[in-house]
């Protein structure tokens, strides 16, 4: 149901996630294979039969004025708040056009999303929802600065300076990070869906269109193809997408901001999809030679085709290029870090030891994003994470509801020196993104993983023997269960290849991460 609430122009407006959105001047028709094929099943539309539970006194509070734009189910207007004269945007949705239950669900979901994100500085502010016998009214902040797309096109060469681009990208990443903490994936990040609050050059950017957005349960994936062709991530086309797809889209936008061209282009949508799946962005053409290495590194790490190796929104906010001029307090807790902390307790003892060894080989520059995450969780800034701070951090990943006993179990697994606290070294071992380390710098991965291996391989013969494993871990009793997990060829010892495989893959006991008990079904 997303509508761009611009007092200048409305592009890509749509009242239904199941319908095509209006074409924009710089993008092909957004795709949505969820389009319903059901026939109308009754003389009274579902919308007319539904009480949405919203207030019934819209006209007592607002006077509708100038038309801004329209979608499939209704129109968007400027309206005046009667008590104080404030100008707002009102989307008026026609109940008679909500024929099927899915259309009603879409309206309710959009309101739910706007309420969930209410208060975020880079999301259009939700004021209220009303209804009467004929319409649903969604009242929001009015943005009068125009679309991000229009500002791009107004720039010389259709591109931003690096400094200005970083400011814009930082705001989009903050929106994505906030969405992901709420168990929400935007699914249609593109310049047309961001508006400026005002025409001022330093106006804040606002995300306005959540028409394709959806809640997702932890560990689950979307299996449909939605979004806009130029910005769609490879995993969306493979029908296995999640929050990572939003970061890919922001990577595409960043590429456009910096050079004025799309990274993946063809004359047809099928051609675009093939480009997305097969090719890498071109950094050899003008003006990339004049763009900083830091900016190029940032874009490349967002446009990694493997979603496991792609930066998360929170990690991207820690990157030197986008962080310059920003504050550490802008960086939200990273859902992938929280997931890694939850998973660490499920890993075998051997994998926990291996990850600790790998973490000890990394320098500060390689784990700067994890330093930001540690500092965000360490509320009292005493250099360690307490049980209460761990509980507060894990609670920020809203779809999960962990019992205190489970939080204590997680902290105990991470706390290798058993002092009841998690220091930074222990935190890195549990929070590390191994796939990213391998993808972003394969040579460094080879060196780091070998160095970790050699912490076990005391005689440097190229294998970890049972006795070396026992000496490193300090474990008593049979070492066979640990050895068996990594010893793929069953020769009674662990090679470097087998050790790297252990680092890359979750242990056998944790390959199926369960959805949290008591997960709130937000749909």
Curated annotation (Swiss-Prot):
On whether Transferase is a keyword of this UniProt record, the answer is yes
Residues that hold Ca(2+) 4 according to the record:
487, 489, 491, 493, 498
Give residue ranges for domain EF-hand. 365-400, 402-437, 444-479, 482-509
Signal peptide feature range: none
Q: What did gene disruption experiments reveal?
A: Severe growth defect in shoot elongation. Severe growth defect of flowering stem.
Q: Name one GO biological process term.
A: protein phosphorylation
Positions binding ATP in this chain are: 68-76, 91
EC main class here is: transferase
Q: What residues does Ca(2+) 2 bind to?
A: 415, 417, 419, 426
Tell me which residues bear Phosphoserine: 228, 318, 495, 515
Cross-referenced InterPro entries: CDPK_Ser/Thr_kinases (IPR050205), EF-hand-dom_pair (IPR011992), EF_Hand_1_Ca_BS (IPR018247), EF_hand_dom (IPR002048), Kinase-like_dom_sf (IPR011009), Prot_kinase_dom (IPR000719), Protein_kinase_ATP_BS (IPR017441), Ser/Thr_kinase_AS (IPR008271)
PROSITE patterns for this protein: EF_HAND_1, EF_HAND_2, PROTEIN_KINASE_ATP, PROTEIN_KINASE_DOM, PROTEIN_KINASE_ST
* UniProt GO cellular component terms: plasma membrane
Xref: SUPFAM superfamilies:
EF-hand, Protein kinase-like (PK-like)
Q: What is its EC number?
A: 2.7.11.1
- Write one Gene Ontology MF term: ATP binding
Q: Which residues does the annotated region (Autoinhibitory domain) include?
A: 328-358
Regulation of protein activity: Activated by calcium. Autophosphorylation plays an important role in the regulation of the kinase activity.
Which residues are listed for Ca(2+) 1 binding in this entry?
378, 380, 382, 389
- Residue positions of the active site: 188
Residue positions of S-palmitoyl cysteine lipidation? 4
Task: Give the CDD domains listed for this entry.
Answer: STKc_CAMK
Instruction: Outline the subunit composition.
Output: Interacts with BIK1.
Function of the molecule: May play a role in signal transduction pathways that involve calcium as a second messenger. Acts as a developmentally controlled regulator for coordinated stem elongation and vascular development. Acts as a key component which contributes to the developmental switch that establishes the transition from vegetative to reproductive growth. Involved in pathogen-associated molecular pattern (PAMP)-triggered immunity (PTI) signaling. Interacts with and phosphorylates the kinase BIK1, a central rate-limiting kinase in PTI signaling.
UniProt name for this protein = Calcium-dependent protein kinase 28
Specify the species: Arabidopsis thaliana (Mouse-ear cress)
* Source taxonomy: Eukaryota, Viridiplantae, Streptophyta, Embryophyta, Tracheophyta
């Amino acid at each position: 149901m997303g509508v761009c609430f611009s007092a200048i122009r409305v592009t890509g407006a749509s009242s239904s996630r199941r319908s095509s959105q209006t074409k924009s001047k710089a993008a092909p028709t957004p795709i949505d294979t969820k389009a319903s094929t059901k026939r109308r099943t009754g003389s009274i539309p579902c919308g007319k039969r539904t009480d949405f539970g919203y207030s019934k006194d819209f006209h007592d509070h607002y006077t509708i004025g100038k038309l801004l734009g329209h979608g499939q189910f209704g129109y968007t207007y400027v309206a005046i708040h009667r008590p104080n004269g404030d100008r707002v945007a009102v989307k008026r949705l026609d109940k008679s056009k909500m024929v099927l239950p899915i259309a009603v669900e879409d309206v309710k979901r959009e309101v739910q999303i706007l309420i969930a994100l209410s208060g975020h500085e880079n999301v259009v502010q939700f004021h209220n929802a009303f209804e009467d016998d004929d319409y649903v009214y969604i009242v929001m902040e009015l943005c009068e600065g125009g679309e991000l797309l229009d500002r791009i096109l107004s720039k010389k060469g259709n591109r931003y300076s690096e400094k200005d681009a970083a400011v814009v990208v930082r705001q989009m990443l903050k929106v994505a990070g906030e969405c992901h903490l709420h168990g929400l994936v935007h699914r249609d990040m593109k310049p047309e869906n961001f508006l400026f609050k005002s025409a001022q050059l330093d106006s804040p950017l606002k995300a306005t269109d959540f028409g394709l957005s959806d809640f997702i349960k932890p560990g689950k994936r979307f299996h449909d193809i939605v979004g806009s062709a130029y910005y769609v991530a490879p995993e969306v086309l493979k029908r296995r997408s999640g929050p990572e797809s939003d970061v890919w889209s922001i990577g595409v936008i960043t590429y456009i901001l910096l050079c004025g061209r799309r990274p993946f282009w063809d004359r047809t949508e099928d051609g675009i999809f093939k480009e997305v799946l097969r090719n890498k962005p071109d950094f050899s053409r003008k003006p990339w030679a004049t763009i900083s290495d830091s900016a190029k590194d940032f874009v490349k790490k967002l446009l990694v085709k493997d979603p496991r190796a792609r930066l998360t929104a929170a990690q991207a906010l820690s990157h030197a290029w986008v962080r310059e001029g920003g504050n550490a307090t802008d960086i939200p807790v990273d859902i992938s870090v929280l997931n890694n902390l939850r998973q660490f307790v499920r890993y075998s003892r051997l994998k926990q030891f291996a990850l600790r060894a790998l973490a000890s080989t990394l320098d500060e520059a390689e784990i700067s994003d994890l330093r930001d995450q540690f500092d965000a969780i360490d509320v009292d800034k005493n250099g360690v994470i307490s049980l209460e701070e761990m509980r507060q951090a894990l609670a920020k990943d809203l779809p999960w509801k962990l019992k205190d006993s489970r939080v204590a179990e997680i902290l105990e697994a991470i706390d290798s020196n058993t002092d009841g606290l998690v220091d930074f070294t222990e935190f890195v071992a549990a929070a590390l993104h191994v796939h990213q380390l391998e993808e972003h710098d394969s040579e460094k991965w080879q060196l780091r993983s070998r160095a970790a291996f050699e912490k076990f391989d005391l005689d440097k013969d190229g294998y970890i023997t049972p006795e070396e494993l026992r000496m490193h871990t300090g474990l008593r009793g049979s070492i066979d269960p640990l050895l068996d997990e990594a010893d793929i060829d069953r020769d009674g010892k662990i090679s470097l290849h087998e050790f790297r495989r252990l680092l890359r893959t979750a242990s056998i006991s944790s390959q199926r991460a369960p959805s949290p008990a008591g997960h709130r079904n937000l749909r």
